[in-house]
C-alpha cells in the first residue's frame, strides 16, 4: 500500500544500496529500497540524483555503462517509484548505454519532443536523434 508521503532518494542512498560498501549505511539503504520495492513506501529518484549516481559510478568506481544503466533502470521500475519523469529517465538510460553520450544530454534528448526542442551547440544531440533547433 502506497503512503501519501513520497521520499526523494538522494545519491548516497542509491550508491550504498547498489555498492553494498558501508557497514552501517548499506543495510539501511537496502531496507529502505526493499520497502520501495514492496510498495510500503513511495519514493522518487530525482533526475539530478540519477545524474550524480551515473557520474560517481562511472568516474569514481569505474562501473561499466551497461551495469550502471541496468541497475538504475531496474531501480526506477520498482513498484514504489513514482517519478512523473520515469519514462524519460528510463529512455535516457537506454540512450546512455547505446550512444556513449553523457547522461545529461541523454536526459535532455529523452525529454525533448517536436513541441519542446533542445537548443544547443552540442553535436551529440544529432547522434541521439533528439528534437533540436540550432541558433
Briefly describe each language-model feature range:
Residues 1-45, 60-67, 128:
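Short, well-structured N-terminal submotif of metal-dependent ribonuclease cores
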Residues 1-6, 109-110, 114-135:
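Acidic, PIN/NYN-like endoribonuclease modules and their adjacent C-terminal/linker elements
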Residues 46-49, 88:
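Short, conserved alpha-helical segments within structured domains
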Residues 35-36, 75, 95:
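Hydrophobic helix-cap positions at the C-terminus of alpha-helices
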Residues 54-78:
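Active-site-proximal, substrate-binding regions of enzyme catalytic domains
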Residues 9, 44-45, 83, 103, ...:
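Short beta-strand scaffold positions
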Residues 79-117:
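Active-site neighborhoods of divalent-metal-dependent phosphate/nucleic-acid chemistry enzymes
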Residues 10-12, 52, 105, 122:
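Acidic active-site catalytic centers that drive phospho-/nucleotidyl reactions
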Amino acid at each position: 500500500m502506497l503512503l501519501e508521503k513520497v521520499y526523494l532518494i538522494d545519491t548516497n542512498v542509491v550508491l550504498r544500496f547498489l555498492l553494498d560498501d558501508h557497514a552501517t549505511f548499506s543495510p539501511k539503504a537496502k531496507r529502505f529500497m526493499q520497502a520501495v520495492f514492496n510498495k510500503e513506501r513511495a519514493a522518487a529518484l530525482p533526475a539530478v540524483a540519477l545524474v550524480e549516481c551515473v557520474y560517481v559510478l562511472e568516474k569514481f568506481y569505474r562501473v561499466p555503462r551497461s551495469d550502471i544503466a541496468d541497475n538504475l533502470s531496474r531501480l526506477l521500475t520498482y513498484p514504489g517509484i513514482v517519478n512523473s519523469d520515469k519514462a524519460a529517465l528510463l529512455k535516457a538510460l537506454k540512450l546512455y548505454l547505446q550512444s556513449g553520450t553523457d547522461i545529461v544530454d541523454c536526459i535532455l534528448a529523452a525529454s525533448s519532443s517536436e513541441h519542446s526542442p533542445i537548443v544547443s551547440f552540442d553535436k551529440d544531440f544529432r547522434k541521439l536523434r533528439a528534437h533540436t533547433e540550432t541558433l
